[in-house]
């Protein structure tokens, strides 16, 4: 079995390889937003590392010891090229209608709640699958930059 990476390792990779980020930590959720020069109030979502289940987000079973989920968002075209058509939005408290075990470890999959918005995730990535997920982080970063530029023009 491959070595699973730590949250610290992944955070260090993100902070070292993606510039212009703002980091926020709340309720065991490490969130990164693109906000070059802090022009926007909160910035634009880039990626999240979540360590626990939420009221409406239990499908990943993150309350297991040492389990976390790395998530990011892809633009529509990248998402469709990689995963096909987006599922419909889930009802509050439910997960998207997909044939996944969202609690699986080290498997790149659609996000159990936000797949309809283009989010993907992996629980406890191994070094091998993190290398693959890095490409998705880059796509998410480029999406965040593009969205940021649109928003600052509108100011």
Language model: regions and residue ranges:
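Charge-dense, helix-prone N-terminal extensions
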Residues: 1-155
């Amino acid at each position: 079995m491959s070595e699973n990476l730590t949250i610290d390792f992944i955070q260090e990779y993100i902070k070292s390889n993606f510039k212009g980020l703002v980091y926020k930590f709340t309720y065991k959720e490490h969130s990164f937003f693109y906000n070059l020069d802090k022009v926007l109030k909160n910035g634009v979502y880039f990626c999240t590392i979540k360590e626990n289940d939420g009221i409406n987000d239990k499908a990943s079973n993150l309350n297991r010891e040492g389990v976390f989920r790395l998530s990011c968002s892809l633009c529509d075209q990248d998402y469709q090229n990689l995963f096909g058509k987006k599922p419909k939005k889930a009802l509050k408290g439910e997960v998207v209608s997909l044939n996944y075990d969202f609690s699986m470890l080290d498997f790149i999959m659609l996000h159990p709640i936000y797949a309809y918005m283009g989010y993907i995730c992996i629980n406890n990535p191994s070094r091998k699958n993190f290398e693959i997920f890095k490409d998705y982080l880059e796509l998410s970063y480029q999406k965040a930059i593009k969205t940021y530029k649109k928003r600052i023009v509108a100011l």
